[in-house]
Amino acid sequence: KVYHFLGKDNIPFHTIFWPGTLIAAKDTFIGKEKVNFVLPHKVIGYEYLNWEGQKFSTSKGVGLFSDEVADLFPIDYWRFYLSSILPDSKDSNFDWSDFQRRINNELIANYGNLFYRVTHFIKSNFDGKVPKGKLDKDGEELYKKLEEAAAKIKKNVGDVHLRTALNNVFAFTSEVNKYFQKKKPWEKKNAYDVGNTI
């Protein structure tokens, strides 16, 4: 399936002219091969993403462009940050201080910390294998939240509400971090119970 992601000013071109061109090109031959082009499954129009309060402009040198970003920070930082500020319902703004804050506080401190805690805990306490066991009450509640979060996130992604999906991922990782804090698996007497939930 083909998805188009574009700014609101390009919606007419991608919903009328481009599909019309593809339909008109039906049964086109390229050399001896007959080709049909795939129509967009969904066109997602966004509001504007601004650069520190200004419109992006290549001619004025306002903004940062895709050929430059990979040299500055890991590409996953960019994916995360841009997904977190997608202008799906109103214009949004790229801001360096917000970029730094979200990377440090959300991606690293929340998600990265959780990933490290879980994998390190499994490696240290269970020889790197996820243990099987019975859930306690807190574990059952967390598992229920996981199922609810997974259903929401699946629907968000299916509806192409990517920022909402990301927000739901991070809401759940916050719940798991709270669970770890409450259970204190670093105290050996709690390791088995927490291992059951993992």
Predicted regions and their residues:
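Short hydrophobic "helix-edge" motifs at membrane interfaces and signal-peptide entry regions
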Residues: 3-5, 64-65, 149-151
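Short, conserved micro-motifs enriched in small and acidic residues
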Residues: 3-16, 105, 109, 195-196
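Alpha-helical support elements that line or immediately flank enzyme active sites
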Residues: 17-25
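Active-site and channel-lining beta-strand-loop segments
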Residues: 20-21, 31-61
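NTP-dependent nucleotidyl-transfer catalytic core
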Residues: 1-5, 12, 25-41
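Catalytic adenosine-cofactor/nucleotide-binding cores of aminoacyl-tRNA synthetases and other
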Residues: 47-140
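Helix-rich, typically C-terminal accessory recognition domains appended to large enzymatic cores
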Residues: 98-135, 142-198
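Glycine-centered helix-coil hinge/cap
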Residues: 7, 73-74, 161
